[in-house]
């Protein structure tokens, strides 16, 4: 049978999770070892940032561990030495605060007005005022002239001089080109003489009323693109999350709001988690020895189970093969309560498909000896798998499967 392309399976999942992430901002991919949680997290990053995401400043990945603290992840103190050899304790941003600042800077800048838009809005406003003035002049005079042209109409989106219908957009564009940008190569698309005459008269009117365009502070030359920033936290439940996140548990939900922190960095106690910062955690559900995710944190994350599946009909990388026979045999151990402890759910512990992919450097025998068997024996030791059932030892079952 010809192998099917696995793109629809993965793409549908990624597309669905992107929509979830855009709404919730925080997502945890949970499942047994080897189900591809980190792989899917990176696929999400590629979808939201681009295929070269790992080289981008918009992407970070960190792995939690039991001794991970707030001072490692959010803000902490570093010790420096001055010129006299004295120790100085300096509050500093760590991974999350630093990344959040970068994301927030982009978010704020992307909402700033560009210079081009600012100029356009200013000229439109002045042109509107000038049209109001022209309308008033027409009511009190029989002939109102713009240069040598008689003004015959002032309408919501244009004026009429002589036989020429000049749109507001035409005059505004021409005024910006000549009077602000000093673009000598600009030529109006039509009504050349009438347009330049109107621009000249309009310019004189503004000068008489002391109106000159000046770019205000904070206006950017070019519009800044709003970018997505992705932080992957691998093994997120291995750390004590309430301790690591601290007051930022609030910020996870209330994006864009200032949250006061324990440390003052460069005169500012606050941290903002902006709407364009997305957090993806991965969680090994088989590991019961790690930290518990409490309800306050759980409420702020969306959770998605990534389950073990048979991928024999999915496209793999060159040189990779999926041992579906071995996969199916091992999965049977978890299919019922014969060997699986009643306290556990199959989807939390069933060994993932990545354990059954062989390559030129990772043979079937190596997978079994160094990965599959050690994990299953750890499961037995932890009580996930029963040592015996109906007088049969599980080691006998493993020996018959793993050969």
Segments predicted by a language model, with ranges:
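C-terminal regulatory/interaction module of P-loop NTP-utilizing enzymes
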Residues: 1-403
